[in-house]
Amino acid sequence: CFEKSVHLNGKILHSFRIIPDRGSWLEVQFDTNDLAYVYLDRRRRRRKFLVTTFLRALGYPTERDLVSNFYNIQKLKISEKMNEESLASLMPFEDIMDGEVVVARSYEPLSIGVIRQLVALGQKTVEVIDSSEDEILVKSLKKDPAHDEESALKDIYRKLRPGDPPTAANARALLKRLFFDPKKYDLTRVGRYKINQKLKIDIDSNERIMVGEDFLAATKYLLGLKKGEGILDDIDHLGSRRVRAVGELLANQCRVGLARTERLVKERMTLFDVNIEGMTPQKLINPKALSAVVRDFFGRSQLSQFMDQTNPLAELTHKRRLSALGPGGLNRDRAGFEVRDVHTSHYGRICPIETPEGPNIGLINSMCTYARINEFGFIETPYRVVKKSKVTNTIEYLTADQEEGYLIAQANNPIDKKGGFLNERITARERGEFIEVDPSRVDYMDVSPKQLVSVAAGLIPFLEHDDANRALMGSNMQRQGVPLLRSDSPYIGTGLEEKAARDSRSVIVSEADGIVAASSAEYIITTKDGKLPVSE
Protein backbone atom coordinates (compact mmCIF):
# COMPACT_ATOMS: atom_id res chain seq x y z
CA CYS A 1 0.00 0.00 0.00
CA PHE A 2 1.73 3.22 -1.21
CA GLU A 3 0.54 6.45 0.40
CA LYS A 4 1.53 10.06 0.97
CA SER A 5 1.07 12.43 3.90
CA VAL A 6 1.70 16.16 4.31
CA HIS A 7 4.12 17.30 7.05
CA LEU A 8 3.39 20.36 9.19
CA ASN A 9 5.92 22.34 7.14
CA GLY A 10 3.97 21.50 3.95
CA LYS A 11 6.38 18.88 2.60
CA ILE A 12 4.88 15.73 1.03
CA LEU A 13 6.20 12.52 2.62
CA HIS A 14 5.76 9.30 0.64
CA SER A 15 5.53 5.92 2.38
CA PHE A 16 4.56 2.28 1.88
CA ARG A 17 3.26 -0.46 4.14
CA ILE A 18 3.43 -4.24 3.75
CA ILE A 19 0.45 -5.63 5.69
CA PRO A 20 0.28 -9.44 5.99
CA ASP A 21 -2.78 -11.46 6.95
CA ARG A 22 -0.86 -12.65 10.02
CA GLY A 23 2.39 -11.19 11.33
CA SER A 24 4.26 -7.91 11.80
CA TRP A 25 3.40 -4.82 9.79
CA LEU A 26 6.30 -3.11 8.04
CA GLU A 27 6.29 0.58 7.12
CA VAL A 28 8.84 2.69 5.24
CA GLN A 29 8.48 6.47 5.26
CA PHE A 30 10.56 9.46 4.18
CA ASP A 31 11.32 12.15 6.75
CA THR A 32 11.70 15.89 6.02
CA ASN A 33 15.41 15.38 5.21
CA ASP A 34 14.59 12.84 2.44
CA LEU A 35 15.91 9.92 4.50
CA ALA A 36 13.88 6.70 4.19
CA TYR A 37 13.29 4.95 7.56
CA VAL A 38 11.82 1.52 8.34
CA TYR A 39 9.28 1.20 11.18
CA LEU A 40 8.43 -2.26 12.50
CA ASP A 41 6.25 -1.09 15.38
CA ARG A 42 3.53 1.50 14.77
CA ARG A 43 3.22 2.34 18.47
CA ARG A 44 6.91 2.91 19.13
CA ARG A 45 7.78 5.23 16.24
CA ARG A 46 11.19 6.08 17.70
CA ARG A 47 12.48 2.56 17.02
CA LYS A 48 13.38 3.21 13.41
CA PHE A 49 16.36 2.45 11.20
CA LEU A 50 17.46 3.38 7.70
CA VAL A 51 16.10 1.48 4.70
CA THR A 52 19.67 0.70 3.55
CA THR A 53 20.38 -0.97 6.93
CA PHE A 54 17.34 -3.22 6.50
CA LEU A 55 18.32 -4.10 2.90
CA ARG A 56 21.78 -5.19 4.07
CA ALA A 57 20.13 -7.47 6.65
CA LEU A 58 17.77 -8.95 4.03
CA GLY A 59 20.47 -10.35 1.77
CA TYR A 60 22.28 -7.44 0.13
CA PRO A 61 25.28 -7.39 2.50
CA THR A 62 28.07 -5.74 0.49
CA GLU A 63 28.08 -2.16 -0.69
CA ARG A 64 28.24 -3.33 -4.32
CA ASP A 65 25.24 -5.69 -3.92
CA LEU A 66 23.17 -2.84 -2.51
CA VAL A 67 24.21 0.11 -4.70
CA SER A 68 24.15 -1.79 -8.03
CA ASN A 69 20.39 -2.32 -7.62
CA PHE A 70 19.75 1.43 -7.61
CA TYR A 71 22.63 3.08 -9.48
CA ASN A 72 24.88 2.25 -12.41
CA ILE A 73 28.46 1.65 -11.15
CA GLN A 74 30.90 2.57 -13.91
CA LYS A 75 34.64 3.06 -14.37
CA LEU A 76 35.61 6.65 -15.14
CA LYS A 77 38.80 7.36 -17.07
CA ILE A 78 40.62 10.26 -15.44
CA SER A 79 42.15 13.04 -17.52
CA GLU A 80 43.09 16.69 -17.04
CA LYS A 81 40.65 17.72 -19.79
CA MET A 82 37.64 17.05 -17.56
CA ASN A 83 35.40 20.00 -16.65
CA GLU A 84 32.65 20.61 -14.09
CA GLU A 85 29.90 19.64 -16.58
CA SER A 86 31.36 16.19 -17.26
CA LEU A 87 31.70 15.57 -13.50
CA ALA A 88 28.17 16.70 -12.64
CA SER A 89 26.20 14.05 -10.71
CA LEU A 90 29.22 11.66 -10.54
CA MET A 91 30.26 10.37 -7.10
CA PRO A 92 33.03 7.95 -6.04
CA PHE A 93 31.66 4.50 -5.20
CA GLU A 94 34.36 3.96 -2.52
CA ASP A 95 36.73 6.20 -0.55
CA ILE A 96 39.72 7.19 -2.72
CA MET A 97 42.87 6.82 -0.61
CA ASP A 98 46.47 8.03 -0.90
CA GLY A 99 48.12 5.74 1.64
CA GLU A 100 46.17 6.59 4.79
CA VAL A 101 45.01 9.99 3.56
CA VAL A 102 41.47 10.24 2.13
CA VAL A 103 41.52 12.08 -1.20
CA ALA A 104 37.76 11.83 -1.82
CA ARG A 105 34.93 10.44 0.30
CA SER A 106 32.45 7.98 -1.18
CA TYR A 107 29.11 9.45 -2.26
CA GLU A 108 30.50 13.01 -2.24
CA PRO A 109 30.37 14.93 -5.58
CA LEU A 110 33.61 14.82 -7.60
CA SER A 111 35.34 18.14 -8.20
CA ILE A 112 38.09 19.38 -10.53
CA GLY A 113 40.41 19.63 -7.51
CA VAL A 114 39.97 15.92 -6.71
CA ILE A 115 40.59 14.98 -10.37
CA ARG A 116 43.85 16.97 -10.37
CA GLN A 117 44.97 15.17 -7.20
CA LEU A 118 44.20 11.79 -8.81
CA VAL A 119 46.13 12.75 -11.98
CA ALA A 120 49.09 13.76 -9.79
CA LEU A 121 48.89 10.38 -8.00
CA GLY A 122 48.95 8.62 -11.39
CA GLN A 123 45.51 7.00 -10.99
CA LYS A 124 44.00 6.11 -14.40
CA THR A 125 40.44 5.08 -13.49
CA VAL A 126 38.02 5.40 -10.59
CA GLU A 127 34.69 3.66 -9.91
CA VAL A 128 31.82 6.13 -9.76
CA ILE A 129 28.02 6.11 -9.56
CA ASP A 130 25.81 8.33 -11.69
CA SER A 131 23.23 10.08 -9.49
CA SER A 132 21.76 12.24 -12.26
CA GLU A 133 18.30 10.70 -11.85
CA ASP A 134 18.14 11.09 -8.08
CA GLU A 135 20.31 11.45 -5.00
CA ILE A 136 17.63 10.21 -2.60
CA LEU A 137 19.23 6.89 -1.66
CA VAL A 138 22.71 8.46 -1.57
CA LYS A 139 21.61 10.46 1.49
CA SER A 140 20.66 7.23 3.29
CA LEU A 141 23.93 5.53 2.22
CA LYS A 142 25.95 8.45 3.65
CA LYS A 143 24.16 8.33 7.00
CA ASP A 144 23.99 4.52 7.27
CA PRO A 145 26.09 3.36 10.26
CA ALA A 146 26.19 -0.23 8.93
CA HIS A 147 28.50 -1.30 6.10
CA ASP A 148 27.94 -5.07 6.06
CA GLU A 149 25.30 -7.64 7.01
CA GLU A 150 26.53 -8.28 10.56
CA SER A 151 26.68 -4.61 11.58
CA ALA A 152 23.23 -4.07 10.00
CA LEU A 153 21.73 -6.98 11.97
CA LYS A 154 23.25 -5.70 15.22
CA ASP A 155 21.97 -2.17 14.58
CA ILE A 156 18.42 -3.46 13.96
CA TYR A 157 18.52 -5.67 17.07
CA ARG A 158 19.81 -2.76 19.17
CA LYS A 159 16.81 -0.66 18.11
CA LEU A 160 14.19 -3.40 18.56
CA ARG A 161 15.58 -4.92 21.80
CA PRO A 162 17.37 -2.04 23.57
CA GLY A 163 18.22 -4.00 26.74
CA ASP A 164 19.58 -7.23 25.20
CA PRO A 165 23.20 -7.74 24.07
CA PRO A 166 23.24 -7.38 20.25
CA THR A 167 24.64 -10.37 18.39
CA ALA A 168 24.24 -11.26 14.71
CA ALA A 169 22.73 -14.67 15.59
CA ASN A 170 20.08 -13.14 17.88
CA ALA A 171 19.23 -10.50 15.28
CA ARG A 172 18.96 -13.08 12.50
CA ALA A 173 16.63 -15.21 14.66
CA LEU A 174 14.50 -12.15 15.48
CA LEU A 175 14.11 -11.17 11.80
CA LYS A 176 13.29 -14.77 10.88
CA ARG A 177 10.62 -14.84 13.58
CA LEU A 178 9.13 -11.55 12.35
CA PHE A 179 9.10 -12.05 8.57
CA PHE A 180 10.40 -15.44 7.46
CA ASP A 181 8.57 -17.95 9.67
CA PRO A 182 5.47 -19.33 7.83
CA LYS A 183 3.84 -20.13 11.19
CA LYS A 184 3.94 -16.49 12.31
CA TYR A 185 3.97 -14.55 9.03
CA ASP A 186 1.54 -15.16 6.18
CA LEU A 187 0.92 -12.90 3.20
CA THR A 188 -1.64 -15.41 1.84
CA ARG A 189 -2.00 -16.14 -1.88
CA VAL A 190 -3.86 -12.85 -2.31
CA GLY A 191 -1.04 -10.85 -0.70
CA ARG A 192 1.56 -12.53 -2.91
CA TYR A 193 -0.60 -11.92 -6.00
CA LYS A 194 -1.03 -8.20 -5.17
CA ILE A 195 2.69 -7.68 -4.43
CA ASN A 196 3.68 -9.40 -7.69
CA GLN A 197 1.11 -7.37 -9.63
CA LYS A 198 1.93 -3.96 -8.09
CA LEU A 199 5.73 -4.26 -8.13
CA LYS A 200 5.86 -6.22 -11.43
CA ILE A 201 7.98 -9.02 -9.98
CA ASP A 202 7.61 -12.76 -10.58
CA ILE A 203 7.79 -14.73 -7.34
CA ASP A 204 6.10 -18.12 -6.92
CA SER A 205 2.52 -17.78 -5.63
CA ASN A 206 3.26 -20.44 -2.98
CA GLU A 207 5.93 -18.16 -1.41
CA ARG A 208 3.77 -16.66 1.31
CA ILE A 209 6.50 -15.04 3.42
CA MET A 210 8.30 -11.80 2.62
CA VAL A 211 11.51 -12.13 0.57
CA GLY A 212 14.31 -9.62 0.03
CA GLU A 213 13.20 -9.04 -3.56
CA ASP A 214 9.78 -7.80 -2.33
CA PHE A 215 11.33 -5.15 -0.11
CA LEU A 216 13.87 -4.12 -2.76
CA ALA A 217 11.17 -3.71 -5.44
CA ALA A 218 8.94 -1.78 -3.01
CA THR A 219 11.83 0.56 -2.14
CA LYS A 220 12.48 1.17 -5.86
CA TYR A 221 8.79 1.97 -6.39
CA LEU A 222 8.86 4.38 -3.42
CA LEU A 223 11.89 6.19 -4.88
CA GLY A 224 9.97 6.39 -8.18
CA LEU A 225 7.01 8.01 -6.38
CA LYS A 226 9.39 10.58 -4.91
CA LYS A 227 10.49 11.44 -8.47
CA GLY A 228 6.89 11.69 -9.67
CA GLU A 229 6.65 8.23 -11.26
CA GLY A 230 4.15 5.50 -10.36
CA ILE A 231 0.65 5.69 -8.87
CA LEU A 232 -0.39 6.02 -5.22
CA ASP A 233 -2.88 3.44 -3.93
CA ASP A 234 -6.50 4.47 -3.42
CA ILE A 235 -7.74 2.62 -0.35
CA ASP A 236 -11.38 2.86 -1.57
CA HIS A 237 -10.61 1.41 -5.02
CA LEU A 238 -12.02 -2.11 -5.47
CA GLY A 239 -8.57 -3.24 -6.60
CA SER A 240 -7.47 -2.64 -2.98
CA ARG A 241 -10.57 -4.17 -1.34
CA ARG A 242 -11.64 -7.78 -1.45
CA VAL A 243 -14.56 -9.91 -0.30
CA ARG A 244 -13.84 -12.30 2.55
CA ALA A 245 -16.24 -15.19 2.05
CA VAL A 246 -17.76 -17.31 4.83
CA GLY A 247 -15.22 -20.10 4.28
CA GLU A 248 -12.29 -17.78 4.91
CA LEU A 249 -13.85 -16.32 8.07
CA LEU A 250 -14.64 -19.83 9.33
CA ALA A 251 -11.09 -21.01 8.55
CA ASN A 252 -9.71 -18.18 10.72
CA GLN A 253 -11.98 -19.27 13.59
CA CYS A 254 -10.92 -22.90 13.14
CA ARG A 255 -7.27 -21.82 13.36
CA VAL A 256 -8.02 -20.21 16.74
CA GLY A 257 -9.88 -23.34 17.92
CA LEU A 258 -7.09 -25.71 16.78
CA ALA A 259 -4.46 -23.55 18.52
CA ARG A 260 -6.43 -23.88 21.78
CA THR A 261 -6.81 -27.64 21.24
CA GLU A 262 -3.04 -27.95 20.64
CA ARG A 263 -2.31 -26.14 23.90
CA LEU A 264 -4.70 -28.38 25.85
CA VAL A 265 -3.15 -31.55 24.33
CA LYS A 266 0.35 -30.40 25.33
CA GLU A 267 -0.83 -29.70 28.88
CA ARG A 268 -2.39 -33.18 29.16
CA MET A 269 0.75 -34.84 27.80
CA THR A 270 2.84 -33.22 30.55
CA LEU A 271 0.39 -34.48 33.20
CA PHE A 272 0.18 -38.07 31.92
CA ASP A 273 3.05 -40.54 31.79
CA VAL A 274 3.78 -41.09 28.08
CA ASN A 275 4.68 -44.75 28.63
CA ILE A 276 1.29 -45.65 30.11
CA GLU A 277 -0.36 -48.33 28.04
CA GLY A 278 -3.78 -47.54 26.77
CA MET A 279 -2.97 -43.91 25.96
CA THR A 280 -5.22 -43.05 23.02
CA PRO A 281 -5.85 -39.86 21.01
CA GLN A 282 -9.40 -39.85 22.38
CA LYS A 283 -8.03 -39.44 25.92
CA LEU A 284 -5.66 -36.64 24.92
CA ILE A 285 -7.73 -34.60 22.47
CA ASN A 286 -10.80 -32.72 23.66
CA PRO A 287 -12.69 -31.37 20.61
CA LYS A 288 -14.83 -29.02 22.72
CA ALA A 289 -12.40 -26.11 22.25
CA LEU A 290 -12.82 -26.30 18.46
CA SER A 291 -16.56 -26.96 18.44
CA ALA A 292 -17.16 -24.06 20.88
CA VAL A 293 -15.38 -21.61 18.57
CA VAL A 294 -17.32 -22.81 15.49
CA ARG A 295 -20.63 -22.71 17.38
CA ASP A 296 -19.83 -19.21 18.63
CA PHE A 297 -19.03 -18.08 15.07
CA PHE A 298 -22.39 -19.20 13.68
CA GLY A 299 -24.38 -18.27 16.77
CA ARG A 300 -23.01 -14.92 17.92
CA SER A 301 -20.95 -13.45 15.07
CA GLN A 302 -21.97 -9.95 13.96
CA LEU A 303 -22.25 -11.25 10.39
CA SER A 304 -24.36 -14.30 11.28
CA GLN A 305 -27.92 -13.14 10.57
CA PHE A 306 -31.36 -14.70 10.36
CA MET A 307 -32.27 -14.80 6.66
CA ASP A 308 -34.85 -12.28 5.47
CA GLN A 309 -37.60 -14.34 3.78
CA THR A 310 -40.42 -11.81 3.46
CA ASN A 311 -40.50 -12.49 -0.29
CA PRO A 312 -38.21 -14.16 -2.89
CA LEU A 313 -36.40 -10.87 -3.64
CA ALA A 314 -35.63 -10.29 0.06
CA GLU A 315 -34.02 -13.74 0.28
CA LEU A 316 -31.98 -13.28 -2.91
CA THR A 317 -30.79 -9.79 -1.93
CA HIS A 318 -29.78 -10.93 1.56
CA LYS A 319 -27.58 -13.67 0.05
CA ARG A 320 -25.89 -11.17 -2.31
CA ARG A 321 -25.14 -8.57 0.38
CA LEU A 322 -21.65 -7.18 1.04
CA SER A 323 -20.75 -5.74 4.45
CA ALA A 324 -17.82 -3.56 5.48
CA LEU A 325 -18.73 -4.11 9.16
CA GLY A 326 -17.95 -7.05 11.41
CA PRO A 327 -14.72 -8.44 12.90
CA GLY A 328 -11.67 -7.02 11.14
CA GLY A 329 -13.87 -4.47 9.35
CA LEU A 330 -14.99 -0.89 9.91
CA ASN A 331 -16.89 0.64 12.79
CA ARG A 332 -20.05 2.49 11.73
CA ASP A 333 -19.38 5.26 14.28
CA ARG A 334 -15.89 6.00 12.95
CA ALA A 335 -16.40 5.34 9.20
CA GLY A 336 -16.01 8.56 7.22
CA PHE A 337 -17.72 9.87 4.10
CA GLU A 338 -15.05 8.61 1.65
CA VAL A 339 -15.47 4.93 2.52
CA ARG A 340 -19.29 5.20 2.21
CA ASP A 341 -19.24 7.08 -1.09
CA VAL A 342 -19.75 5.58 -4.55
CA HIS A 343 -16.38 4.98 -6.28
CA THR A 344 -15.74 4.78 -10.04
CA SER A 345 -14.39 1.22 -9.59
CA HIS A 346 -17.85 0.12 -8.29
CA TYR A 347 -19.14 0.17 -11.90
CA GLY A 348 -20.69 -3.23 -12.59
CA ARG A 349 -19.47 -4.63 -9.26
CA ILE A 350 -21.23 -2.88 -6.36
CA CYS A 351 -24.67 -1.31 -6.83
CA PRO A 352 -24.60 2.51 -6.38
CA ILE A 353 -28.32 2.55 -5.49
CA GLU A 354 -29.19 -0.26 -3.08
CA THR A 355 -27.90 0.48 0.44
CA PRO A 356 -29.60 1.08 3.84
CA GLU A 357 -30.74 4.62 4.70
CA GLY A 358 -29.61 4.69 8.34
CA PRO A 359 -26.15 4.77 9.97
CA ASN A 360 -25.06 1.83 7.77
CA ILE A 361 -25.44 3.79 4.52
CA GLY A 362 -22.60 2.95 2.14
CA LEU A 363 -21.17 0.31 4.50
CA ILE A 364 -23.65 -2.40 3.51
CA ASN A 365 -24.03 -2.83 -0.25
CA SER A 366 -25.31 -5.30 -2.83
CA MET A 367 -23.46 -7.00 -5.66
CA CYS A 368 -24.45 -5.96 -9.17
CA THR A 369 -26.59 -8.22 -11.37
CA TYR A 370 -23.74 -9.87 -13.32
CA ALA A 371 -20.90 -9.47 -10.79
CA ARG A 372 -19.01 -12.47 -9.46
CA ILE A 373 -16.17 -13.01 -6.98
CA ASN A 374 -12.90 -14.56 -8.22
CA GLU A 375 -10.57 -16.95 -6.38
CA PHE A 376 -8.72 -14.08 -4.67
CA GLY A 377 -11.90 -12.38 -3.41
CA PHE A 378 -11.91 -9.50 -5.92
CA ILE A 379 -15.22 -8.63 -7.61
CA GLU A 380 -15.29 -9.14 -11.38
CA THR A 381 -17.76 -7.84 -13.97
CA PRO A 382 -18.29 -9.17 -17.53
CA TYR A 383 -17.52 -7.32 -20.78
CA ARG A 384 -17.90 -8.21 -24.46
CA VAL A 385 -14.58 -8.25 -26.30
CA VAL A 386 -14.22 -5.72 -29.15
CA LYS A 387 -11.83 -6.73 -31.95
CA LYS A 388 -11.05 -4.41 -34.89
CA SER A 389 -14.06 -2.17 -34.08
CA LYS A 390 -16.40 -5.23 -34.09
CA VAL A 391 -18.25 -6.35 -30.97
CA THR A 392 -17.84 -10.12 -30.51
CA ASN A 393 -19.88 -12.52 -28.37
CA THR A 394 -16.78 -13.47 -26.35
CA ILE A 395 -17.26 -12.58 -22.67
CA GLU A 396 -14.35 -11.72 -20.37
CA TYR A 397 -14.59 -11.01 -16.64
CA LEU A 398 -12.31 -8.20 -15.40
CA THR A 399 -11.41 -6.97 -11.91
CA ALA A 400 -11.26 -3.24 -11.12
CA ASP A 401 -7.47 -3.35 -11.49
CA GLN A 402 -7.50 -5.15 -14.84
CA GLU A 403 -9.93 -2.76 -16.53
CA GLU A 404 -7.83 0.33 -15.69
CA GLY A 405 -5.87 0.33 -18.96
CA TYR A 406 -8.82 -0.30 -21.30
CA LEU A 407 -11.46 1.75 -23.12
CA ILE A 408 -14.93 0.30 -22.45
CA ALA A 409 -17.95 1.27 -24.56
CA GLN A 410 -21.43 1.63 -23.07
CA ALA A 411 -23.99 -1.12 -23.70
CA ASN A 412 -26.49 1.26 -25.36
CA ASN A 413 -24.18 2.24 -28.22
CA PRO A 414 -26.02 1.13 -31.42
CA ILE A 415 -24.38 -1.69 -33.39
CA ASP A 416 -25.29 -3.44 -36.67
CA LYS A 417 -25.95 -7.17 -37.22
CA LYS A 418 -22.25 -7.89 -37.72
CA GLY A 419 -21.28 -6.13 -34.46
CA GLY A 420 -19.91 -2.91 -36.01
CA PHE A 421 -20.60 0.43 -34.32
CA LEU A 422 -23.10 2.60 -36.26
CA ASN A 423 -21.91 5.97 -34.89
CA GLU A 424 -18.60 7.57 -35.83
CA ARG A 425 -18.03 8.69 -32.21
CA ILE A 426 -19.15 6.52 -29.29
CA THR A 427 -19.41 7.00 -25.52
CA ALA A 428 -16.81 5.03 -23.57
CA ARG A 429 -15.19 4.85 -20.14
CA GLU A 430 -11.48 5.22 -19.38
CA ARG A 431 -10.29 5.07 -15.74
CA GLY A 432 -13.81 6.00 -14.58
CA GLU A 433 -14.14 9.03 -16.89
CA PHE A 434 -16.77 9.15 -19.67
CA ILE A 435 -15.37 10.33 -23.01
CA GLU A 436 -16.31 10.26 -26.70
CA VAL A 437 -13.86 8.23 -28.79
CA ASP A 438 -13.36 6.66 -32.19
CA PRO A 439 -14.67 3.01 -32.30
CA SER A 440 -11.22 1.75 -33.36
CA ARG A 441 -9.84 2.62 -29.89
CA VAL A 442 -12.42 0.55 -27.95
CA ASP A 443 -11.29 -2.69 -26.25
CA TYR A 444 -14.47 -3.89 -24.51
CA MET A 445 -18.19 -3.19 -24.34
CA ASP A 446 -20.65 -3.49 -21.44
CA VAL A 447 -22.83 -6.61 -21.68
CA SER A 448 -26.04 -4.86 -20.61
CA PRO A 449 -27.26 -1.58 -19.06
CA LYS A 450 -28.49 -3.75 -16.14
CA GLN A 451 -24.94 -4.66 -15.12
CA LEU A 452 -24.60 -1.29 -13.36
CA VAL A 453 -27.28 -2.05 -10.73
CA SER A 454 -28.28 -4.86 -8.36
CA VAL A 455 -31.24 -7.22 -8.83
CA ALA A 456 -33.53 -5.12 -6.59
CA ALA A 457 -32.74 -1.87 -8.44
CA GLY A 458 -33.02 -3.70 -11.78
CA LEU A 459 -36.63 -4.64 -10.94
CA ILE A 460 -37.69 -0.95 -10.90
CA PRO A 461 -39.40 -0.08 -14.23
CA PHE A 462 -37.99 2.99 -16.01
CA LEU A 463 -35.18 3.24 -13.47
CA GLU A 464 -33.30 5.80 -15.59
CA HIS A 465 -36.18 8.30 -15.09
CA ASP A 466 -36.10 7.86 -11.30
CA ASP A 467 -34.42 10.17 -8.82
CA ALA A 468 -31.50 8.35 -7.13
CA ASN A 469 -32.91 8.83 -3.61
CA ARG A 470 -36.34 7.52 -4.60
CA ALA A 471 -34.74 4.55 -6.40
CA LEU A 472 -32.83 3.73 -3.19
CA MET A 473 -36.09 3.73 -1.21
CA GLY A 474 -37.87 1.74 -3.93
CA SER A 475 -35.22 -0.99 -4.09
CA ASN A 476 -35.32 -1.33 -0.28
CA MET A 477 -39.14 -1.31 -0.04
CA GLN A 478 -39.58 -4.00 -2.73
CA ARG A 479 -38.02 -6.40 -0.24
CA GLN A 480 -40.86 -5.68 2.21
CA GLY A 481 -43.68 -6.58 -0.19
CA VAL A 482 -45.93 -9.44 0.99
CA PRO A 483 -47.74 -11.89 -1.38
CA LEU A 484 -51.22 -11.13 -2.72
CA LEU A 485 -54.15 -13.36 -1.78
CA ARG A 486 -54.68 -13.97 -5.49
CA SER A 487 -51.34 -13.73 -7.27
CA ASP A 488 -51.32 -11.45 -10.30
CA SER A 489 -48.52 -10.33 -12.62
CA PRO A 490 -47.76 -6.57 -12.83
CA TYR A 491 -48.77 -4.50 -15.86
CA ILE A 492 -45.17 -3.32 -16.31
CA GLY A 493 -42.07 -5.40 -15.61
CA THR A 494 -38.40 -5.31 -16.48
CA GLY A 495 -37.87 -8.95 -17.46
CA LEU A 496 -35.84 -9.78 -14.35
CA GLU A 497 -38.83 -10.95 -12.29
CA GLU A 498 -38.82 -14.60 -13.41
CA LYS A 499 -35.04 -14.92 -13.08
CA ALA A 500 -35.06 -13.39 -9.57
CA ALA A 501 -37.84 -15.74 -8.39
CA ARG A 502 -36.26 -18.81 -9.99
CA ASP A 503 -32.74 -18.14 -8.65
CA SER A 504 -33.94 -17.38 -5.12
CA ARG A 505 -35.08 -21.07 -4.99
CA SER A 506 -38.19 -19.98 -3.10
CA VAL A 507 -40.56 -21.10 -5.88
CA ILE A 508 -41.22 -24.66 -7.00
CA VAL A 509 -39.74 -25.33 -10.44
CA SER A 510 -41.03 -28.16 -12.62
CA GLU A 511 -38.45 -30.52 -14.09
CA ALA A 512 -40.16 -30.41 -17.51
CA ASP A 513 -42.46 -28.06 -19.45
CA GLY A 514 -46.16 -28.75 -19.10
CA ILE A 515 -49.60 -27.59 -18.02
CA VAL A 516 -50.91 -27.91 -14.45
CA ALA A 517 -53.39 -30.75 -14.41
CA ALA A 518 -54.13 -30.83 -10.67
CA SER A 519 -52.92 -29.18 -7.49
CA SER A 520 -53.55 -29.23 -3.76
CA ALA A 521 -51.77 -28.09 -0.60
CA GLU A 522 -49.58 -31.19 -0.86
CA TYR A 523 -48.85 -31.64 -4.59
CA ILE A 524 -48.85 -30.06 -8.07
CA ILE A 525 -49.20 -32.36 -11.11
CA THR A 526 -48.13 -31.16 -14.56
CA THR A 527 -48.71 -32.99 -17.82
CA LYS A 528 -48.05 -32.19 -21.49
CA ASP A 529 -51.71 -31.51 -22.34
CA GLY A 530 -52.95 -30.45 -18.90
CA LYS A 531 -55.10 -33.58 -18.53
CA LEU A 532 -54.70 -36.21 -15.87
CA PRO A 533 -54.00 -39.70 -17.23
CA VAL A 534 -57.07 -41.90 -17.06
CA SER A 535 -56.38 -44.88 -14.84
CA GLU A 536 -57.55 -48.23 -16.11
Regions found by a protein language model. Name each.
Residues C1-S323, C368-P483, A521:
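N-terminal non-catalytic structural scaffold regions of very large proteins
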Residues K531-E536:
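A short macromolecule-binding patch
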Residues G122, E357, N365-C368, K528-G530:
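A short beta-strand motif that forms part of the nucleic acid-binding face
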Residues C1-V6, Q302-I364, Q478, P483-A517, ...:
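Conserved mixed alpha/beta core segments that line enzyme active sites in large multi-domain catalysts
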Residues P20, M97-D98, D130, E354-E357, ...:
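Short acidic, glycine-rich loop/turn motifs
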